Amino acid sequence: MKREKKSFHLHMLSDATGETLISVGRAVASQYTMSQATEHIYPMIRNKTQLQRALDEIQQEPGIVLYTIIDKKIKILLRKRCEKIEIPCIDILHPVLNAFKSYLGIPTNLRVSAQHGLNADYFRRIEALDFTIEHDDGQSPNSLSDADVILVGISRTSKTPTSIYLANRGIKTANVPLIPGINLPDTLLGAKNALIIGLIASVERISHIRQNRNLGDDFSLESYTDRINISEELTYAKRICERFSWPVIDVTRRSIEETAAEIFELLSRFREGK
């Protein structure tokens, strides 16, 4: 009898791009073949406001927390919150830094992103991450025209994690929710220099993800997870994409990396056609 994989949430917080952290997290998670990690990636955590956004999501979807953060105050706040909700919180660099310090006999020179050096590619990715975080979930609509890629779709179609993945590769990415009855921002329709892509998924996948999400009092869990409602939302999203000739990617059976690979291909063709 085939056993079902156990799913869990893996939260990864970094004060830089998070590449080191993501590599370690995925390497460890891959050793547990009977488990499937749902990744939540939070790059550029450098102040309490940015941390609080991550903590809110960790509170809603508890799991394993990994981090690479230098600021002591931020680390203490993170650890205290994780202790309060009784979930593991691991600083993946701490034991390595201590080993170096002990062997070399010299103090650690703690600098954010020290491993990257000051090169143009690094600054490009940092700029893309800043832009992407600022333009998550329909925020800052007035500067959508500065995006390289804009992802649109209904709730829980992997818009945010895909945006972060693209930003880590230097692509300024915004994402805008498609909600029946809510007008699209004029700046979205006016973003002629950005590639706009619709993300969809199966009704079953979206319903499952939404059922696992702990919603606030302002939401009706029943209507949010109802398959008929989700089907209507998807129909609306498909019609919008068809009306404006936006390409659509079905993420149902795609990993974030696979979705991003298709987006890179579409972006290459889009830029060639300009």
From Swiss-Prot:
Keyword Ligase in record: no
Pfam families in alphabetical order: Kinase-PPPase
EC code(s) of this entry: 2.7.11.32, 2.7.4.27
Catalytic activity: N(tele)-phospho-L-histidyl/L-threonyl-[pyruvate, phosphate dikinase] + ADP = N(tele)-phospho-L-histidyl/O-phospho-L-threonyl-[pyruvate, phosphate dikinase] + AMP + H(+); N(tele)-phospho-L-histidyl/O-phospho-L-threonyl-[pyruvate, phosphate dikinase] + phosphate + H(+) = N(tele)-phospho-L-histidyl/L-threonyl-[pyruvate, phosphate dikinase] + diphosphate
Entries under InterPro entries matching the protein: Kinase-pyrophosphorylase, PPDK_reg
Binding site for ADP: G153, I154, S155, R156, T157, S158, K159, T160
Enzyme class, first EC level, given as a word: transferase
Record keywords, A-Z: Kinase, Nucleotide-binding, Serine/threonine-protein kinase, Transferase
Gene Ontology molecular function, alphabetical: ADP binding; ATP binding; phosphotransferase activity, phosphate group as acceptor; protein serine/threonine kinase activity
Source superkingdom: Bacteria
Family according to the record: Belongs to the pyruvate, phosphate/water dikinase regulatory protein family. PDRP subfamily.
Its job: Bifunctional serine/threonine kinase and phosphorylase involved in the regulation of the pyruvate, phosphate dikinase (PPDK) by catalyzing its phosphorylation/dephosphorylation.
Protein name (database record): Putative pyruvate, phosphate dikinase regulatory protein
Source organism of the structure: Bartonella henselae (strain ATCC 49882 / DSM 28221 / CCUG 30454 / Houston 1)
Taxonomy of the source species: Bacteria, Pseudomonadati, Pseudomonadota, Alphaproteobacteria, Hyphomicrobiales
